[in-house]
Amino acid sequence: MATTSPCAAPSPSLRCPLALSHPFASPPPPPALRLAGPKLLPGRLAVSPPPGIPAVASALESLILDLDDDEEDEDEETEFGLFQGEAWAAADEREAVRSPELVVPELEELPEQWRRSRIAWLCKELPAYKHSTFTRILNAQRKWITQDDATYVAVHCLRIRNNDAAFRVYSWMVRQHWFRFNFALATRVADCLGRDGKVEKCREVFEAMVKQGRVPAESTFHILIVAYLSVPKGRCLEEACTIYNQMIQMGGYKPRLSLHNSLFRALVSKTGGTAKYNLKQAEFVYHNVVTTNLDVHKDVYAGLIWLHSYQDVIDRERIIALRKEMKQAGFDEGIDVLVSVMRAFSKEGNVAETEATWHNILQSGSDLPVQAYVCRMEAYARTGEPMKSLDMFKEMKDKNIPPNVASYHKIIEIMTKALEVDIVEQLMNEFIESDMKHLMPAFLDLMYMYMDLDMHEKLELTFLKCIARCRPNRILYTIYLESLVKVGNIEKAEEVFGEMHNNGMIGTNTKSCNIMLRGYLSAEDYQKAEKVYDMMSKKKYDVQADSLEKLQSGLLLNKKVIKPKTVSMKLDQEQREILIGLLLGGTRMESYAQRGVHIVHFQFQEDSNAHSVLRVHIHERFFEWLSSASRSFDDGSKIPYQFSTIPHQHFSFFVDQFFLKGQPVLPKLIHRWLTPRVLAYWFMFGGSKLPSGDIVLKLSGGNSEGVERIVNSLHTQSLTSKVKRKGRFFWIGFQGSNAESFWRIIEPHVLNNFASLVTQEGSSIGSDGTQDTDTDSDDDMQMSDTERDE
């Protein structure tokens, strides 16, 4: 029998009055919901939030360590990004957002003694049990329990801050025939889950309110947004923006200043190249702050100008307007603003404005930032004066300002475009000797210059230097491949092309295939050229018109005619196995408007190097299945982290097997499909290799029976595993010799050098940050250790 602490006993008084003016709520029957109530009394049910949102642990830490779920971090919201150290997103304002009052009858008010006793017993025993036993106990009460009784139990769980137990009770309630939607209870459950960092469960209750035709309370919007923003590494920023927009557009609420500022801070917390896509949302936040007559923080102006400076097309008028508004508000332009202005002007090649802003930086008496010199170099380069850019670089070093990676990248880019070979080689040697990282962009610029100058021997030497120091990529190999074709070394080009095709970390694309096709045509090897053409047709790559004409002419000489081939859209065996592995790791599928047609949504973590590599590989492997918008990226670095396939009936089998009513499940025959390639892609997408050598796999969806089939299937391959359940996900772990055996099985199908990437990111598991946020709960943890058979 499970035991509980004395504090688990139910309180005789379970009232939780909090008031919120809610214009969209229809008058409900008392006493279930009271829109105007007294202040919260200490002796009553206190389910108000703790001072801050608990730090949401990573999925891996939740699996390996026994974390304290009650640990809180009051400074969680003031330690990130542009606004570090600012207290204008404080928790006390979060506390001020109030939710509807929930009133529950006192236990002694219930007429039957036996009912009071049973409810008291449930309140005492239920919180100690895990999911399976928890549900069985509730099912055993169906003959007598009512909605009011279950509401009392749920609210008691909230009082003792066992929010997972409260969510289980509430989820069980909504499945009963007697359930009637209770807006106040749903709001309270969602708010408590959000404060506890359980964003998925909070979002589930939130969406249930919307489906009931109710607008969630302001507190629910506010708490859910803050919970999303608290997810590590900003993985749920997009979801936070979605809820924020709904809060204003659907709810008609006016968020507090702290919420505006917290969201804006998250939008500008990433690097410029990534954050520039957040400009539209940042402008929307700024618009809402201004139109609600709230004070605009200085860093909001600075952040907006910073975002505008990274845009491909500079909105000069908007930057001028923001600077004017900033001055009218009484704020001085700091160094960060001046550097952003220089960056914007330099992209336009406006030397006069760039130098004028530079003069303002000099007058400020502050330390001269390296980025300001980079902007000056950019401005002079755009006006056709690359040697002045070089003078800027030398001036920076003369003033004992150490160059950084960005400055080396910029000056090498400028000098390679100017075809200054000796200067570029000298700069490149300095860069390499500095032991700085991120050499790849400089190597690529150098190789492009050698290509333009037909210096193919130096290009090959640069290629060899690069692969010795950097992780190879498709662009690097494509440049080298084109160089080999230009000099007529088709045999070597064929070898390089084969390496690209066989190495999943590199892969081929439209450009590399066209280069190889031109190479075979120049060598008049029409048989091999036809094979490349067939491969391109299958992958739906665009064939250059002149190459197609030469191929047709060459084959005509051999009395062979190329006819347009109708490519049958069918997943090959490798693609099917890859897709199964990704689905086990959490890839989503959805139905299209047309019946029997489905779409696969590939989504990867932007903050994961391992997922970045896997993203390029999956994009290349499923290229023919992707939508036209997703296929338009030839440069691997520009491939989005989210892309989808075309709707096709061929995916129906996988939807039927892996999804039930939109929720992920495990197929009954999954134990037969666990081939080495399936396991490898499951590991690469939703797994991790710990520094100790242990391997962990995250399993999305399914129940204990399905997981047991997987464990037993692995056991037949002499792989003993342990399974833990955390929240809604199962974690399958291999330790010691079992991890070594598992690695030997999957290693032939794992991308080259992928293990080192996934080991470094041991705490980043899965495809979606939101999936990791509920794993720190005290949810049931089922041990399915196959050693029990021994």
Swiss-Prot record:
One of its GO terms (cellular component) is chloroplast. InterPro entries: Chloro/Mito_RNA_Process, Homing_endonucl, LAGLIDADG_dom, Pentatricopeptide_rpt, TPR-like_helical_dom_sf. One of its GO terms (biological process) is photosystem I assembly. PPR repeats lie at residues 182-216, 217-254, 256-296, 299-333, 334-368, 369-403, 404-438, 439-469, 473-507, 509-543. Keywords: Chloroplast, mRNA processing, mRNA splicing, Plastid, Repeat, Transit peptide. Promotes the splicing of group II introns in chloroplasts. Required for the splicing of intron 2 of plastid ycf3 transcripts, a factor required for the assembly of photosystem I (PSI). Involved in the splicing of atpF, ndhA, petB and rps16 chloroplastic transcripts. Required for the assembly of PSI. This is Pentatricopeptide repeat-containing protein OTP51, chloroplastic. The lineage of its organism: Eukaryota, Viridiplantae, Streptophyta, Embryophyta, Tracheophyta.
